[in-house]
Amino acid sequence: MADPARAAKLAQRIKVVVAEALGRRVKDPRVESITVTDARVTNDLQHATIYYTVFGDDVAQADAARALEKAKGVLRQEVGRNITVRLTPTLEFVADQIPVNASNLEELLREAKRRDAEVAALAASAKHAGEADPYKGDSPEDIDEDDFDEEDTDLSGDNDLDEDANR
């Protein structure tokens, strides 16, 4: 079993080889709009999954999937020529869902922005539930002019304390 670092390097190499082979070796016009986005290889280096996106509608995506299945043998042969492993991995092509997920995320962000604007409009026209200034200042009778509390009136016995507050 190969280490994961070797599998990752091999996956990147397979991604490049398949992308180049789609442009050079495969003459099918249905593969012109295919972009290889990622490749993953199992740790035993026997199976490679290649993720791709297709520029176009659902019909173009279905046509591209059929074209990739048809060209799978040519692409595997090209991968076998360009990588240095004992056994050429089998290839599996999977349509990548990143563009769909990205458009869904953009729609969610637009919806959140619209809701934030509604909340901001409601907040601008909102009024306080109680008085306008709920944090009133102290009334004049609550303010004590001296720093002493009323309980600390017996200070006569403190004169005979020394520096360390001992008697």
Swiss-Prot record:
Query: Which residue ranges are recorded for the region named Disordered?
Result: 122-167
Give the location in the cell.
Cytoplasm
Query: Compositional bias of type Basic and acidic residues: which residue ranges?
Result: 128-139
* Originating gene: rbfA
- Name-wise, this protein is Ribosome-binding factor A
Per the similarity annotation, which family is this? Belongs to the RbfA family.
Tell me the organism.
Paenarthrobacter aurescens (strain TC1)
Function of the molecule: One of several proteins that assist in the late maturation steps of the functional core of the 30S ribosomal subunit. Associates with free 30S ribosomal subunits (but not with 30S subunits that are part of 70S ribosomes or polysomes). Required for efficient processing of 16S rRNA. May interact with the 5'-terminal helix region of 16S rRNA.
Q: Name one GO cellular component term.
A: cytosol
Q: Where is the composition biased (Acidic residues)?
A: 140-167
What are the protein's UniProt keywords? Cytoplasm, Ribosome biogenesis
Query: Which GO terms fall under molecular function for this chain's record?
Result: ribosomal small subunit binding
